[in-house]
Amino acid sequence: MEKMTTLKSSENKGILTSTPIRGAGDGMETEEPPKSVEVTHGVQPINQHVLPSPRKKVSSDSPGVLQLGKILNERTVEVEAVRIFVPKAAITHDIPTKNTKVKSLGHHREELHNQAEVVTDPRKELSEVKKVLEKLKNSERRLLQDKEGLSNQLRVQTEINRELKKLLVASVGDDPQYHFERLAREKNQLILENEALGRNTAQLSEQLERMSIQCDVWRSKFLASRVMADELTNFRVVLQRQNRDAQSAIQDLLSEREQFRQEMTSTQKFLEELLVSLQWGREQTYSPNTQPHSTADLALTNHGLAQAIHAHLLGNVGISHQKKIPTTVEFCSTPAEKMAEKVLRILDPVACTESSPDNQFAESSPTTLLTTKKNIGRFHPYTRYENITFNCCNHCQGELIAL
């Protein structure tokens, strides 16, 4: 820490009282009272030197001025006093021990004796004082800069505190201006969000319109396909019905043909026995051959047997006698034949009309067809074929009536 002692010349106040001899044991003993001397760091002593006691206050009319005994008017220099404020953090305390105090005191005494012999130069002292003043001015300048920096920091901190106060007041809700600004910001944000939602809604409406158009297109396609499917279903139902009718007619024809074959077989046996019995005792002109393999062979065999019996019994009769026999015989179709003709007429009515214009017969009722055969394997004609039903079963007889 740098200290400065202000020297002030005064004609009336220039005498310092003599310093008493200190007692032994305090480390600052003096043999005789020396002359008053000012000791400063970096400044040469002026005039005679005196070591004052640190425990005794010096009486002075002006505080802050150290009286240094008798000072000559010729050698006095007036120095302006400048007060320096030093921060507490820059002060360091150095407490010397007892031995160091004694050594420094002895060394200081030798310096005082040597300096007393040297004659000081006023110009040199003036230059040194100027240097000290320059240093003090520099330190003052630095302190002013520090003060300015601290002032700026204080101003910034004050502004921050003001803003914090505003925020605190706004958070409490007592500031209507902040509330109005917040409402304005929220309104602007809501306007932007509303515009974005409006654009999204427009895009969604366009997509919805396109989707509705596509839905209409696919609905029309579906309806058209449904109509086509219904037509195909009806056509399939008709074809299935015709197929079942044709199958039933074929089965009926085959069953009738089987019955005719059995009857013709029995007729063949009867005719052969009759022909053999007629040739009894005579030369046999007929001998039984192998059994026929088809209905046509069976019919041909029966026809030959009938001719042989006819020739044996009646002989050779001329054509004139055959013409006398009435030939106006009207044949009727069997139920199976009628069913077959009906199926053919349904499948191709034009061809049936052209091929058999003279074959006109009354169609038999369904009751007649059902009574002639117990189960002809057909479906009921009035069903819709969702659930396939038969018009006959193994335990029932008669016609099924669709309600």
Curated annotation (Swiss-Prot):
Residues 123-216 form a coiled coil. The keyword Chloroplast does not apply. Residues 397-403 are annotated as: Essential for interaction with GORASP2. GO terms for molecular function: ubiquitin protein ligase binding. Keywords: ADP-ribosylation, Coiled coil, ER-Golgi transport, Golgi apparatus, Membrane, Phosphoprotein, Protein transport, Transport, Ubl conjugation. A motif (Tankyrase-binding motif) lies at residues 22-26. The modification Phosphoserine is found at residues 53, 356. It is found in: Golgi apparatus membrane. ADP-ribosylated by tankyrase TNKS and TNKS2. Poly-ADP-ribosylated protein is recognized by RNF146, followed by ubiquitination. Ubiquitinated by RNF146 when poly-ADP-ribosylated, leading to its degradation. One of its GO terms (cellular component) is Golgi membrane. It holds the Pfam family DASH_Hsk3. Changing residue 403 to R: Reduced interaction with GORASP2. The tankyrase-binding motif (also named TBD) is required for interaction with tankyrase TNKS and TNKS2. Interacts with GORASP2. Interacts with the GTP-bound form of RAB2, but not with other Golgi Rab proteins. Identified in a complex with RAB2 and GORASP2. Required for normal Golgi structure and for protein transport from the endoplasmic reticulum (ER) through the Golgi apparatus to the cell surface. This is Golgin-45.
